[in-house]
Amino acid sequence: VVQPRCVIAPAVGQRGNTVPSSTLDIHQLESLRDVYRDLHANPELSFAEHRTAGVVAAWLRDHGFEVIENVGRTGVVGVLANGIGAVVALRADMDALPVAEDTGLPYASTVRAASAGEYVPVMHACGHDMHVACLLGACAELVGAREEWSGTVVAIFQPAEELAQGAQAMVDDGLYDRVPRPDVVLGQHVAPLPAGTVGIRAGDFWAASDSLRVVLYGAGGHGSRPETTVDPVVMAAAFVMRLQTIVSRQVAAADTAVVTIGSLNAGTKANIIPDSAELMMNVRSVDPEVRSRVLAAITRIARAEAAAAGAPREPEITLFESAPTLTNDPAAMARTLPALASVVGPERVIDPGPIPSSEDVPILATSIGVPLVFWLLGGADPVVYAGARTVEEMQAVVGRIPSNHSPLYAPVISPTLELGISTLVTAARVWLG
């Protein structure tokens, strides 16, 4: 959940003049709204974004982009060369989540798909469908205004952000050997802030994310004779409780860290003590030193609890997903910020402070040593925020409305779509000649 901390100018919780002018006509905008509804109704899981990639590739070709498909498995890249000038990368992610939608929208997803050996519901619960629609609209607008700028636009439609693997997959697949090297990477993420609001800050912005699998090994046996066993369930329970002390006792109050145990699985029957217990957990952090300290503490505690229980072998600890801290380049942000403010108005640009959400988009910039500028795009109906004029009042609203990853979450289409197009276009035009 995004918690606004600092308002660069007083936030306005009302509609106001939040739909910017655009070179796209009413028919093009309605077409993009249809694209959004279609993507929302047809979500696809990470690295399975085949239909979405097809929609993207067809749109880009129809608008004169050179298109490269299957980059990093299901990624799509569009290149629009328009004379001499800077190369600007604009990025959107495409994947959805294994969530059963409960929005009640007429275009709500009823999709189910295979995932890890089972069929699961699928939903665009994080707004990636809006990201795709906004970037497609930005591409169309940049084509329509190509006589007003020069340079090259690289539109990156990335798979598998939810696994924190898609950006690296595209880089490893030779993304930057196949397109012009960008001078800057720009992107946005929809959030439950009022539509017409942009959230951004220089420096560390989004937390790093690390997901781990820990297997604790015991010695199974009959539930009536626990003295003949080493019970991994009790071991896991002690491990979970001890993990709660990492943030409260080993991380300074001024630092940011979160340790969450998302699943604990052990056993098959009530009267059987199993041989092992598996835990899945996620760590969020901002400072690299804090990140290292928390990960080291998890390993130390797992081994110590196993030793205390008399486990027959050491635990197995696997890091299977990892995303770096998202850091906005201060100079690049200072250059881009006035453009964003020109779209929504300076009074609607807020500093939300460091947030514990994570993104793998930094890899697209750090892998080639170029700056990143990334912002939050408000997607909640501004009416919900009517009368909220202080940070505290905005926080109260954020806390009671659906947020990303909720089965109830969906951004309001307008003015979110129009503003998302304009923020991308206006930010890109700052860098293009």
Segments predicted by a language model, with ranges:
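Divalent metal-coordination and catalytic microenvironments
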Residues: 39, 78, 90, 128, ...
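Histidine/acidic-residue-rich, glycine-tolerant segments that coordinate divalent metal ions
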Residues: 77, 97-99, 106-123, 129-130, ...
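Short, flexible, mixed-charge acidic loops at enzyme active sites
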Residues: 100-112, 203-207, 336, 386-400
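Metal-dependent amide/peptide-bond hydrolase catalytic core
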Residues: 234-433
